[in-house]
Curated annotation (Swiss-Prot):
Subunit record text: Monomer.
Residues involved in Mn(2+) binding: D350, D548
GO molecular function: isocitrate dehydrogenase (NADP+) activity; metal ion binding
Protein name per Swiss-Prot or TrEMBL: Isocitrate dehydrogenase [NADP]
Family note: Belongs to the monomeric-type IDH family.
Lineage of producing organism: Bacteria, Pseudomonadati, Pseudomonadota, Gammaproteobacteria, Pseudomonadales
Length: 741
């Protein structure tokens, strides 16, 4: 590469809208410093369009940018800023396909039950786009996530609201005690490179190959586990009864987006059990209209619209009768009657549990009020972490954002580590029997008894990423002089193998004076919470799932959101992936923008990632201008926080676009004031003056654009001209940036 490049990703929903405003500013400020800022489209719509070129006209076709970035991530030149994207559930996938079809893209329909070879191929291609299809491709490194000092200081000065806790709160986590993934896990260490075969030997002796070939490397850990359908159903039935008896809300917390094979099936089992009476009574007609429990009870409401009105009313009445008998469900939207069981992707454990803990352990009930809640997290692997936090809050009260310590994370995720890489090795078992994993010589590595309907899965964790993860943990512990805790459970087969590797690889480093320990997740939570309450920091060194969960849990307690985290992925080949926060893509922000022209998305995550990206580029390419841009951007970000120029929540107040103006103003002022680079100083002195002189006018033009509905001709694939006009409504601001373009 001659010119150093930063790749800025185009994604979905609120961050995608914000990009229309922020990207022109980034390009304007970096253009003169020998830095090319390019975009690549990894949005849901973009990935759909790139996957089906043979259905499209030449002008509609686009390149497969995700595949290109996946290759780039394995090179030292990678410098990618990754914004949150949709991890599509089936309902979202179908909605995006429909929108594109209406825009003239002749994409095939999503075949729920493919019959022909063509339909099977179409479904397989669509299914690759489903769930968390982006992050595993780009994450060719492990994760370093922490709250930057400026953000932590701001949170201490301006604490977010935390709900008070009562010692007699009835809220708790409910998990299985047998028959889950945790209880059944087995693991093996791979001796030589090659591949393994996964097959089901049924009771009658017949054999079905579930996956013919999965490549493995020497030193890799593989594990397998089973979620028993019968054990899950028995557990759910008992918990429904218990919630009714205790008078608490029933809520279910899974991750149907990322765990796109296993969790929708578990969700479906819970829906089946809860609505059993109504679903059994109408089983025949529901089968005819194609209702799928895995898509939630919302799918039933959508599909019964094709039935005669009398039949619709009968089914709806029977569902209401279920609600009268069952415990009250936690609500996603009590005004609209949308329950926790409507859509699998509405309640996602890593976001929903911290929100519940922050709200005094309560969730919203059908009456629009907060109530104590039973949080059902079926598998035991990580459920205990949340139960410990609840117990701690019941004993000591809510956390205090003005004094609490921080829990930065070093997470193992490179090369699709652990559960988050298991989707292509997860199966719903069709018949009773045994699942066997064998190597190329036929040697048996793993074996498990299964019953029809069970979920069986295999996970992998390669040796090089584990070595890199241990190195990153030691580096962060040394750099910050903070205790580092490996969250590993010796009672789990997989973790026992990882512990052996961690103990071995720690010997490669000088750890004198460092506090590095290995604790089970439950013990690690207790240890970290005790330190948090003393105002002390503790590094969590975790596997892939806890990386995801904890980088929501602790930041939401500390900062009120996980979107304000610095999220760096030092790629194993030397490049950098800079993720903008750890939150999602905020569909409610888009809804508000379309209804009233107000975008409340906070781009702080993008500001932090851009500064880290510029710093990486400056060091990698010996580009001092990039380092000046990075340090002045950090100053500007700090000033936005100090002067309270982040987006508010309602029309008439500053929104995302206003915060971008202030970023440009403060960044230009910092560049004009610095003396390290005279060229940049001279170039930005005039810009800083123009923005300063026109502050009132620009703020007025941005405010005038609020308060009315906005039409951008699409949700997943909006019209670029209409969106740009809506997101950049200040002619004065646009003109001030023009000389830099």
């Amino acid at each position: 590469m001659s010119t150093p490049k930063i790749i800025y990703t185009l994604t979905d929903e609120a961050p995608a809208l914000a990009t229309y405003s922020l990207l022109p500013i980034i390009k304007a400020f970096t253009g003169s410093s020998g830095i090319a800022v390019e975009t690549r489209d990894i949005s849901l719509a973009g990935r759909l369009i790139a996957t089906f070129p043979e259905y499209l006209t030449d002008t509609q076709k686009i390149s497969d940018d995700l595949a290109e970035l996946g290759k780039l991530a394995t090179t030292p030149d990678a410098n990618i800023i990754k914004l949150p994207n949709i991890s599509a559930s089936v309902p979202q996938l179908k909605a995006a396909i429909k929108e594109l079809q209406q825009q003239g893209y002749k994409l095939p329909d999503y075949p729920e039950e493919p019959k022909t070879d063509t339909e099977k191929d179409v479904k397989a291609r669509y299914d690759k786009i489903k769930g968390s299809a982006v992050n595993p491709v780009l994450r060719e490194g492990n994760s370093d996530r922490r709250a930057p000092l400026s953000v932590k200081n701001y949170a201490r000065k301006h604490p977010h609201k935390m709900g008070a806790w009562s010692a007699d709160s009835k809220s708790h986590v409910a998990h299985m005690d047998n028959g889950d993934f945790y209880g059944s896990e087995k693991a093996a260490l791979i001796g030589a490179p090659g591949s393994v075969k996964i097959e089901l030997i049924a009771k009658d002796g017949s054999s079905t190959v579930l996956k013919a070939k999965t490549s493995v490397q020497a030193g890799e850990i593989i594990d397998s586990s089973v979620m028993s359908k019968n054990a899950l159903r028995n557990f759910i039935a008992a918990e429904i009864e218990d919630a009714k008896k205790q008078g608490v809300l029933l809520s279910v917390h899974l991750k149907a987006t990322m765990m796109k094979v296993s969790d929708p099936i578990m969700f479906g089992q819970i829906v089946s059990e809860f609505y059993k009476d109504a679903l059994t009574k109408h089983a025949e007609v529901l089968k005819q209209i194609g209702f799928d429990v895995n898509n939630g009870i919302g799918d039933l409401y959508a599909r019964i619209k094709t039935l005669p009105e009398a039949k619709q009313k009968e089914i709806e009445a029977d569902i209401q009768a279920v609600y009268a008998q069952r415990p009250q469900l936690a609500m996603v939207n009590s005004d609209k009657g949308i329950t926790n069981l409507h859509v699998p992707s509405d309640v996602i454990v890593d976001a929903s549990m911290p929100a519940m803990i922050r709200d005094s352990g309560k969730m919203w009930g059908p009456d629009g009020k907060l109530h104590d809640t039973k949080a059902v997290i079926p598998d035991r692997c990580y459920a205990g972490v949340y139960q410990v936090v609840i117990e701690d809050c019941k004993q000591h009260g809510a956390f205090d954002p003005t004094t609490m310590g921080s829990v930065p994370n070093v997470g193992l995720m490179a090369q699709k580590a652990e559960e988050y890489g298991s989707h292509d090795k997860t199966f719903q078992i069709p018949a009773d029997g045994v699942v066997r994993v064998t190597d190329e010589s036929g040697k048996l590595l793993l074996e498990q008894s299964v019953e029809a309907g069970d979920i069986w899965r295999m996970c992998q964790a390669k040796d090089a990423p584990i070595q890199d993860w241990v190195k990153l943990a030691v580096n962060r512990a040394r750099a910050t002089n903070t205790p580092a805790v490996f969250w590993l459970d010796p009672a789990r087969a997989h973790d026992a193998q990882v512990i052996a590797k961690v103990e071995r690889y720690l010997k490669d480093y000088d750890t004198s004076g460092l506090d590095i320990r290995i604790l089970s997740p439950v013990e690690a939570t207790r240890f970290s919470l005790a330190r948090i309450r003393e105002g002390k920091d503790t590094i969590s060194v975790t596997g892939n799932v806890l990386r995801d969960y904890l980088t929501d849990l602790f930041p939401i307690m500390e900062l009120g959101t996980s979107a304000k985290m610095l999220s760096i992925v030092p790629l194993m080949s030397g490049g950098g992936l800079f993720e903008t926060g750890a939150g999602g893509s905020a569909p409610k922000h888009v809804q508000q923008f379309l209804e009233e022209g107000y975008l409340r998305w906070d781009s702080l995550g993008e500001f932090l990632a851009l500064a880290a990206s510029l710093e990486h580029l400056g060091n990698a390419y010996k580009n001092p201008k990039a380092l000046v841009l990075a340090s002045t951007l950090d100053q500007a970000t700090g000033k936005i926080l100090d002067n309270n120029k982040s987006p508010a929540r309602k029309v008439g107040e500053i929104d995302n676009r206003g915060s971008h103006f202030y970023l440009a103003l403060y960044w230009a002022q910092a560049l004009a004031a610095q003396t390290e680079d005279k060229e940049l100083q001279a170039q930005f002195t005039g810009i800083a003056k123009a923005l300063t002189d026109n502050e009132t006018k620009i703020v007025g033009e941005l405010a005038a654009a609020q308060g009315k509905p906005v039409d951008i001709a699409g949700y997943y694939h909006p019209n670029t001209d209409l969106t740009s006009k809506a997101i950049r409504p200040s002619a004065t601001f646009n003109a001030a940036l023009a000389p830099l373009a």
